[in-house]
C-alpha cells in the first residue's frame, strides 16, 4: 500500500514538478534563454541546444500522410503453428512440449487464450502473474477476474512504475482487488520487469 500511495501522490504532483531539462533552438537569443532558465529554475547544465527540430512528436504528422509507398507494411505478430486452430485444449499442447513466445513478434493472443482456459478449467487451482503495461480494457484482466469469480486463487504483481501508464495500472490493480485478487505492487525502488 505504501508504494501505491506514493505512486498516486507522484501522479498528482507530476503536473507541478520542476523542469528537468530545457531544449532550445541554437538560434534562440541569449536573453530569451536566460529568461526561460530563470523562470523555469533550470541551471545551464540542464539546457540543451540543438540545431535540429524541437518537439519531435510533430513528426507523426508525416506518418499520417496517405503515402503507403513510404511506409513499412503493418506488422502482424505470428501465432505458433501448434497454437493455431486448436481443436483441443491449449493445455494439451503444453503437455506435449514447452512453448516460448517472443513478444511483440509472436501474438499475445495465445497468452490470453491460456488465461481464459485456465479461468474455466476445474483442474486449475491458481493463477499467478506479473502485469506491466496493462492497457485499456485488457482481456488479461478480464480473464483474471473471471478466474477469481470461479473461485480460483489469483495473485498478480502489478508494476506501478510503467512510466505514464501508472494511472491505468493503478485502476486495473484496484479492479482486480475488488473481486478478491491478491495484488502486490512490488517494492519501493525496485522494478519487477525488464526489457531484453
Segments from the language model and where they lie:
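N-terminal localization/anchoring segments of enzymes in phospholipid and broader phosphate metabolism
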Residues: 1-196
Amino acid at each position: 500500500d505504501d508504494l501505491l500511495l506514493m505512486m498516486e501522490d507522484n501522479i498528482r504532483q507530476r503536473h507541478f514538478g520542476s523542469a528537468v531539462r530545457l531544449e532550445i533552438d541554437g538560434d534562440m537569443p541569449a536573453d530569451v534563454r536566460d529568461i526561460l532558465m530563470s523562470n523555469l529554475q533550470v541551471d545551464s547544465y540542464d539546457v540543451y541546444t540543438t540545431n535540429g527540430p524541437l518537439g519531435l512528436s510533430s513528426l507523426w504528422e508525416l506518418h499520417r500522410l496517405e503515402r503507403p509507398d513510404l511506409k513499412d507494411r503493418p506488422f502482424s505478430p505470428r501465432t505458433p503453428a501448434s497454437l493455431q486452430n486448436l481443436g483441443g485444449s491449449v493445455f494439451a499442447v503444453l503437455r506435449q512440449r514447452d512453448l516460448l513466445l517472443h513478444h511483440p513478434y509472436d501474438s499475445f493472443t495465445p497468452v490470453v487464450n491460456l488465461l481464459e482456459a485456465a479461468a474455466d478449467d476445474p483442474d486449475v487451482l491458481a493463477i499467478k502473474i506479473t502485469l506491466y503495461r496493462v492497457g485499456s480494457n485488457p482481456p488479461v484482466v478480464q480473464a483474471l477476474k473471471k478466474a477469481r469469480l470461479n473461485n480460483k486463487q489469483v495473485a498478480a504483481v502489478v508494476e506501478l512504475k510503467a512510466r505514464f501508464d501508472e494511472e491505468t495500472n493503478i485502476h486495473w490493480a484496484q479492479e482486480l482487488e475488488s473481486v478478491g485478487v491478491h495484488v502486490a505492487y512490488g517494492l519501493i525502488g525496485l522494478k519487477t520487469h525488464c526489457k531484453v
